[in-house]
Swiss-Prot record:
The lineage of its organism: Bacteria, Bacillati, Bacillota, Bacilli, Bacillales. The gene is gltX. This is Glutamate--tRNA ligase. Its EC number is 6.1.1.17. Monomer. It catalyses: tRNA(Glu) + L-glutamate + ATP = L-glutamyl-tRNA(Glu) + AMP + diphosphate. ATP binds at residue 255.
Length: 485
């Protein structure tokens, strides 16, 4: 009988949930759910100096926001816990002591200064820097001497000589490494904390992980983990290394690149929809059959096939994400769009935190004008700017429109119509524009464009009668007067 699929997402709490980490989690989630397997969250927090406050909470909170759930983990428990590495130190100790006893690992007393000098010498000689094995076979007398000096050892894994390590990668097909390319690597640091490669191999085995799907940057760790599996006589899981995510310059996405929004929390704050972010990330390095790009989470689960993970780097296209979020925004009811928009209008000082019923109705109608156009909640601030300014600036194209010979006549006639209106309603505005057409004989662009530009400052925008109605009589007349002079 085939083993049940068990995969894990194992972040370090060294920062908030990044788009790259979210993709790793999402592909593991889809892989597990597609095969009725188990999805596990494990926190790899042994690099205590790099852990940040709130890092773990951010990971879990925003995975949930994206719509993912998990079967085992730090917050839900499970039979293979604990799921936080700093709570598993006794487990690691027992196992690395076993390696020491069997001579498969040894204590290394070299200082950082000695190791650095060794590295510099290798580089100067044109060699690849790696540990040369100086303390591989220390005598008892040497060990006693180092300990008398107060040196604290690390523990290194004894890498087998002249061995090929080959594995069939789910994404890359066959990958091969040679053991002679590796020095004996540290499995326990001087502070007694296991290194990444040792802890990961132990955890993946003890948690019965069947498939390890992770980023391309981990591929050089794989042979080291295979050596540890082999040393204990454990079955090796299947590995899959997903290609890097690159920016539009085809360079690896860097967390330091502030020109691209890269953290899930930021997208939530900007008023993006979790379903759209999920959809976008699911297509970063994976492609479905056909041309369709908009899918629900359930559809992704049903069709996810790891064989369709791309071998080429995944392009992070910010404009495509905006387009995709807009597709989802269009499907939302107005209440949801209002909820996503209001905090940004408050933050920009456009509206107060507390609104009267009349103000609530007005701002709701303003947001409704842009429902189909909005890419994300925060965009409402820029889109609706004309409703919150006394005067408008005219675009270059708009300035050309206002130079037309018919403009003063059209605007004077329209101002007269607006002045006479009892209520600024879209239907009444529409009727007023028709009356101007009848009065002046101007129609089409010669009629509509001067009115649009003079009242809104724009040559394109929402339905004109609706926009003018929401601007209110005073603003509209002031703007018309400014152009008429």
């Amino acid at each position: 009988m085939e083993k049940q699929v068990r995969v894990r997402y194992a972040p370090s709490p060294t920062g908030h949930l990044h788009i790259g980490n979210a993709r790793t989690a999402l592909f593991n989630y889809l892989f597990a759910r597609h095969q009725d397997g188990k999805f596990i969250i494990r926190i790899e927090d042994t690099d205590v100096k790099r852990n940040v406050a709130g890092g773990e909470e951010s990971q879990l909170k925003y995975l949930k926001w994206l719509g993912m759930d998990w079967d085992e983990g730090v917050d839900v428990g499970g039979e293979f816990g604990p799921y936080r590495q700093t709570e598993r130190l006794d487990i690691y100790k027992k196992l690395y002591e076993d390696l020491l006893e069997r001579g498969l690992a040894y204590k290394c007393y070299m200082t950082e200064e000695e190791l650095e000098a060794e590295r510099e010498g290798q580089i100067a000689r044109g060699e690849t820097p790696r540990y040369a094995g100086n303390h591989r076979d220390l005598t008892e007398a040497q060990v006693k001497e180092f300990e008398a000096e107060g040196r604290i050892p690390s523990i290194r894994f004894r890498v087998p000589a002249d061995r090929d390590y080959t594995f069939k990668d789910i994404v890359k097909d066959e990958v091969a490494f040679h053991s002679n390319d590796f020095g004996d690597f540290v499995i326990v640091k001087k502070d007694g904390i296991p290194t990444y490669n040792f802890a990961v191999a132990v955890d993946d085995h003890l948690m019965e992980i069947t498939h390890v799907l992770r980023g391309d940057d981990h591929i050089s760790n794989t042979p080291k983990q295979m050596m540890i599996y082999e040393a204990f006589g454990w079955d090796i899981p299947q590995f899959g290394h997903m290609t890097l995510i690159v920016n539009e310059s085809r360079k690896k996405l860097s967390k330091r690149d502030e020109s691209i929004i890269q953290f899930i929390e930021q997208y939530k704050e900007l008023g993006y929809l979790p379903e759209a972010i999920f959809n976008f990330i699911a297509l970063l390095g994976w492609s479905p059959v056909g041309e369709e790009e908009i899918f629900s989470q359930e559809e992704f689960i049903k069709m996810f096939d790891a064989a369709r993970l791309s071998k080429s780097p995944a392009l992070f296209d910010s404009q495509k994400l905006k387009w995709m979020n807009n597709q989802y925004m269009k499907k939302q009811d107005l209440d949801t769009v209002v909820e996503l928009s209001l905090p940004h209008l408050v933050k920009a000082g456009r509206i107060g935190e507390t609104l009267s019923e009349q103000e609530q109705a007005w701002i709701r109608d303003v947001i409704a004008l842009y429902h189909e156009q909005m890419s994300f909640g925060a965009e409402i601030v820029e889109l609706s700017e004309m409703f919150f300014k006394d005067h408008v600036d005219y675009e270059e194209e708009g300035q050309e429109v206002l130079k037309g010979e018919q403009v003063p006549e059209v605007l004077r006639a329209f101002a007269g119509q607006v002045e006479a209106l009892e209520a600024m309603e879209p239907a009444a505005i529409k009727a007023a524009i028709k009356a101007v057409q009848k009065e002046t004989g101007h129609k089409g662009k010669n009629l509509f464009m001067p009115i649009r530009v003079a009242t809104t400052g724009q040559t394109h925008g929402p339905e004109l009668p609706n926009a003018i109605a929401l601007l209110g009589k005073e603003k509209v007349l002031n703007r018309l007067q400014k152009v008429i002079g």
